[in-house]
Structures are given as structure tokens and as C-alpha cells.
Amino acid sequence: MSALLDRLRTDLSALAGQGLRRVRRSNALPCAPRALVDGREMLAFCSNDYLGLAAEPALATALAQASSRWGAGSGASHLVSGHYAVHDALEHRLAAFVGAERALYFSTGYMANAGIVPALVGRGDAVFADRLNHASLVDGVLLSRADMHRYPHGDLAVLARQLAGSSAARKLIVTDAVFSMDGDVAPLADLLELAERHDAWLMVDDAHGFGVLGPQGRGALADAGLQHWRLIYVGTLGKAAGVSGAFAAGHGELVEWLLQKARTYIFTTGAPPALAEALLLSLDLIEAADDRRTHLAGLIERFGAELTLSRWQRLPSRTPIQPIRIGGNEEALAVARALWDEGLWVPAIRPPTVPAGSARLRVSLTAAHTEADVLRLARTLNRLEHAAHG
């Protein structure tokens, strides 16, 4: 047998031995708090479907009707023949929704981030990145071959020193808006002030804020009251929006440059036009979802108030991402298994997704959960911690 396969087997065994080997679970029901896994009914706190739109009947109907009208696929890349009138309509609607001059629709959030950064910076340029940024931003920086300066999470003093010490012709600050494993919100106004002071772009990945934060769910920049030509806003359309894809929004010339230079936009088949049509309805639903956002905010508050943890730590978060830091990989996995045995599906997040020694449960609350759901989870966590640590 090949030494290549032997090496793979050894590496896979090592992952398992460190508690780092990932396992997929197959859900036999549509995306909702109630799941069916291996024939067992579970109450799930896993998805990023923050407004409960993924299985919204009106949205499913719109997608089915759009598929009948547009067919199943686009047939080509956007810059050949895979760009349709409904893609234009979606981009205009997205730009207006977030208050930008123009928007560009990408197939996924990962592709947006991996394409935008290399389109803006390259060798000899400098990128300044929060250490807890999403992997797609990290990969975008690596692909760009620009010099990467990572600053400790939220440490603006270090960032300011890094910016002041850089002689790069082009500078780019990149940050999550809502950090995906911590749930906290970046200090966007302060970051923009630093970007202005040092003549840098500021790229904000609002994967977990779009649809949830700000007036009518218009996102983290709207929540902070920020608009500026140097802002590059990235929103995800497969989380709160309930469908699929992502978009970049900003100054018109910036977006035109991305259209010309973002390789993950140029060299891939365009997203099906039916998805774009469904997303037009999704934006209407987001805009009208104040009741859902109010309900979700209430669940977040109720969950925090009900927890009485002393050893495990709930990280402070006003967003639907409610992390419970456990510590070691094996203990986090054991807690997730204990919850699973009680019919509660909560993922254990381990390195390299989070720093070593900070393995955690990533609780995701959605507007489709009930107060009873949230209380059940909180009380079970309280009981499990007491049983484990007294």
C-alpha cells in the first residue's frame, strides 16, 4: 500500500486521538429547531437560520416558482452568459437595502471573502486582521500574498501601532462584524476612524449580523450608523436570509473593480437565477421581520438570565451566537454528547476553529425557537455542570 495512504491514516488517527476529528450528522427534516437524526428527534441549537426563514413556506414557494420560470442553473459564469436580469434586480435591491451605491452577488460567503481581498491588495501591500476573523478572511489574505499583520482580538491600540508602522502603499483592515465563535460585535466606528487616519480600506464581514442587527435587519454598519466610501461590506445570504450566497457592497467604482478582478466571481458558474428571485422575497421578509427580531432578542436575554454556570463560561454576547466556553477538547465533546443524550443538539467547537484551551459549545438561537426550548437548554446545562463539577 502507498506511503501516501499510510500517512493519511496516521494523520486521521492523530486527529481522532486529539478529539479533533469531525463527524457529519444527517438531518432528515427541513432546517428548523426540530431535527430528525438517525431516526431520533432532536431539538437543535446549531443553525445560523437566525430569523427562521430557511423553511418559511412563502420562501419555499417562491423558490419553486422561480425554478419553474428560470430553470435549475445559470449555465455559465456571470461574465459569459450566466448573468440574468434577476441577478441585476437582486444586486440593486441589496445595495439599496444596506445603503450602498452598488452590490455584487457571490455564490457563497467564503468565495466572497476569498476573492475580495486578493482583488484589493497584493505583494507589498499590508492587511491588518483581527486574530479571531473567520477562516475565509484568513484564506483571502493568504491568497493575496500581501503582508498580514494580525492584532489581538479587539485590541485597537495594537492595531493603531501596526498601521502607524506600515509603509505599504495600500492598506486593508479586515474584520468580522459579529465574531462567529464568540458572538461579540467589532468596534466598527473605531475601526473606521483608524482606517481614515491611516488611509486604509475597511472590509467588514457581516455574515452573522445581516438580517439581525440594525434597523429592519440592515446589518452591523446600519446598527452603528456608519457609511463611508472606504467601507467594503460583505453580507451573507444563507444565514438570516435563509437562502444561499453572499454579496459585497460599497462605492460604485470599488464594486466595479471587484467585478473585474475578484477571481472567485469571474471563474465560477453563476448562482442559479432562481436563488436570486427567492432572495428578493427574502429581503422583503427581513425588512418586515421586526417581530421575529424582537422575539429573538427576548430569547437571548432569557437564556443568559437562566444560566447559573460557575465553572463553564457564557461569553458576553447580544447576538444569537451564545458560546459556552468549556476548556478542554474532550470535556467539550463530553458535554455535547451528554446534551445529545438528552435530545439537545449543540455542537462542540474545538481547535483550530477556536484557540487551544478554549473549546466550547456554540449555541445558536433563532426566532423559530420558543422560550420553552431555550429554558430547557439552559436548565440542562446548569444541571450537567453541577453534576460534572459540583
Swiss-Prot record:
Keywords: Biotin biosynthesis, Pyridoxal phosphate, Transferase. Pyridoxal 5'-phosphate binds at G109, Y110, S180, H208, T236. Its EC number is 2.3.1.47. Pathway: Cofactor biosynthesis; biotin biosynthesis. It catalyses: 6-carboxyhexanoyl-[ACP] + L-alanine + H(+) = (8S)-8-amino-7-oxononanoate + holo-[ACP] + CO2. Substrate binds at R22, H134, T353. InterPro entries: Aminotransferase_I/II_large (IPR004839), AON_synthase_class-II (IPR050087), AONS_Archaea/Proteobacteria (IPR004723), AONS_Proteobacteria (IPR022834), PyrdxlP-dep_Trfase (IPR015424), PyrdxlP-dep_Trfase_major (IPR015421), PyrdxlP-dep_Trfase_small (IPR015422). Its cofactor is pyridoxal 5'-phosphate. One of its GO terms (molecular function) is pyridoxal phosphate binding. GO terms for biological process: biotin biosynthetic process. The modification N6-(pyridoxal phosphate)lysine is found at K239. Homodimer. Belongs to the class-II pyridoxal-phosphate-dependent aminotransferase family. BioF subfamily. PANTHER family: 8-AMINO-7-OXONONANOATE SYNTHASE (PTHR13693:SF100), CLASS II AMINOTRANSFERASE/8-AMINO-7-OXONONANOATE SYNTHASE (PTHR13693). Catalyzes the decarboxylative condensation of pimeloyl-[acyl-carrier protein] and L-alanine to produce 8-amino-7-oxononanoate (AON), [acyl-carrier protein], and carbon dioxide. This is 8-amino-7-oxononanoate synthase. It comes from Azoarcus sp. (strain BH72). The lineage of its organism: Bacteria, Pseudomonadati, Pseudomonadota, Betaproteobacteria, Rhodocyclales. The gene is bioF.
